[in-house]
Regions:
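A short, conserved acidic/glycine-rich loop-to-beta-strand motif
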Residues: 123-132
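N-terminal nucleotide-binding beta1-loop-alpha1 segment
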Residues: 1-19, 264
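A structural signal for short hydrophobic beta-strand segments in well-ordered beta-sheet cores
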Residues: 25, 142-145, 201
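Short, high-confidence coil segments that cap the C-terminus of an alpha-helix
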Residues: 46, 97, 124-125, 196-197
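Conserved N-terminal catalytic core of the sugar/cofactor nucleotidyltransferase
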Residues: 2-5, 27, 31-104, 110, ...
Length: 275
């Protein structure tokens, strides 16, 4: 099984944390959110992981070079010189085939990937979107009108929606509908629907946090601290990891990875890195 992790975002909503580290390396418990994602995918049977990186991507390469990842797992890095969007970034990966997972690099979840993929195959879909219930509180009174007259008044209602979890299963045929250049995921969905392709919706009730804002980051951290076993950690948590200066000139060959400067010399931007 293969997975793609989108890890190139600027993380502007999570500042000041992301001024010095990329959002996927923000610590949740005793490890970065990116390592939570990778470990859960490996547990689900993923054998090859492609990371699309950009903002502070060198730090991601250096971190994963020393992370506790089985050497049998193949990691590939793909650089975006300019933003290509949440769907367009897939165009930097030259050999995507069959069925594969795509997910944002800032998602903490206990989703069952095996169940998600089985659902995707059952639906015979070109694309499956994992969804989660989300409540939006309106802090004002909502007025419903008709022809200039008030018909209803609802004080501070709570609205419920099904929202994307930032986790998807692609069939390779979905990639045929990518345009040249940047493309956001919603645009790809509309292109698929216009072409008559099947886009499935997987309802998920697992724990899920989109680590895109300071508030969500703090809620995710609190959940991991209270229930570490859900996320594959020991009940007694050490302090979150600290960032130390690293020597990006150092060769690291144990996992077939190289620090940023060596990778930059050996890898064409926008293409596939050595692995």
């Amino acid at each position: 099984m293969r997975a793609v992790i989108l890890a190139g975002g600027m993380g502007t909503r999570l500042r000041p944390y992301t001024t010095v580290i990329p959002k996927p390396l923000v610590p949740i418990g005793d490890r970065p959110v990116l390592e939570h994602i990778i470990r859960s995918q490996i547990k689900a049977g993923v054998e090859q992981i492609d990371l699309c990186v950009s903002h502070l991507g060198e730090l991601i390469l250096v971190y994963l070079a020393s992370a506790d990842i089985p050497p049998s797992i193949r990691l590939n890095f793909h650089w975006e010189d300019e933003p290509l969007g949440t769907a367009g970034a897939l165009a930097t990966i030259p050999d995507l085939e069959g069925t594969f997972i795509v997910m944002n690099g800032d998602v903490l979840t206990t989703i069952d990937y095996g169940e998600l993929i089985a659902f995707h195959h059952q639906q015979e879909a070109a694309l499956t979107v994992a969804m989660h219930g989300h409540r939006v509180n309106i802090d004002l009174g909502v007025i419903e009108t008709d022809d200039g007259f008030v018909r209803n008044y609802i004080e501070k209602p709570a609205l419920r929606y099904q929202v994307s979890m930032g986790i998807y299963v692609y069939d390779e045929r979905a990639l045929r509908h990518l345009p040249d250049g940047p493309c956001q995921f919603p645009e790809l969905v509309l292109r698929l629907l216009a072409a008559g392709e099947r886009v499935a919706a997987y309802q998920c009730d697992a724990d899920w946090y989109d680590i895109g804002t300071v508030g969500e980051y703090e809620r995710a951290s609190a959940d991991v601290e209270r229930f570490p076993e859900k996320y594959g950690m020991e009940p007694s948590l050490p302090s979150p990891p600290e960032l130390y200066p690293v020597d990006t000139q150092r060769d690291i060959d144990d996992n077939g990875l190289h620090p940023a400067r060596h990778a930059a010399a050996a890898t064409a931007r926008g293409g596939r890195s050595s692995s």
